Amino acid sequence: MNFKHKYVFLFPGLFVLIGILIFPIIFVVRLSLSGWNSYNGLNFIGLENYIRLFTDDPRFWQSFLRLSFLSVTTVILQYVIGFALAHMVWKDIKFQRFFRVLFLIPMMTTPVIMTVIWRTFFHESLGPVNDILSNFGMSPKWLTDPVLAKFTVIIVEVWQWTPFMFLLLLAGLLSLPKEPFLAAAIDGASPVRKFLYVTFPLMAPISIGAIIIRLIEASKIMDTVYVLTSGGPGTATETSSFYIFIKGLREFQMGYAASMSFTYLIIMIISLTVIAKVLTKVLLKD
């Protein structure tokens, strides 16, 4: 077969890529340069939306900082807990298969439905959490206190998506070669030293991939915030995606929402690239 003819087989995939990725991005860029809202058409206004975003909308940047905090915190906790659980069931323990399935249950549930259940759990007067804590003289305002509301969002996100991290890390642990562990056992290495000097370094490439995947997903936190707190109290848990939703689908400032979306996309691409390079340099330094 002629080498050039092989490119013919790439065309179907290329068309799909253009249809689901490139065209929407081009449309968003075009939309961001317009003043399209509930009463104006797709009229071209140049960079006015971007000027407004960078000079006259601190709320967007505050929501982005809030998103960064929530994303980084949840992913760190998911990684630590997920690695601990994966390491536990990686070893030969009783009911190993049962625990592997049990730890995956949160990921199998529908996020929106589970968030509604969590909202009921943390209800100030009707929730079982405060019913228990009231016996100790405590009644935290989980969803109406700015600090506790962030903490509640983190709890729900960690519970929902730690199983995904657990699954990736367990797959990585099961794929590790046995020879380094046998050599460490012969040398008399303790379990802690085995983990620090054998398991963790061997898992570094998988850890980097798992963290980046979860950061990408965590940076799009929307459903949890929408159902659990609606961005409140005030704007205490409002993330960038939720703020874009408000501007675009509640206030119908579609052009301005598109400019925020494109700016957000560029920032996330740059941020995740830097994070990936830093993690690679730190974890794969040897």
Predicted region positions:
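A structural signal for multi-pass alpha-helical bundles of membrane permease subunits
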Residues: 2-286
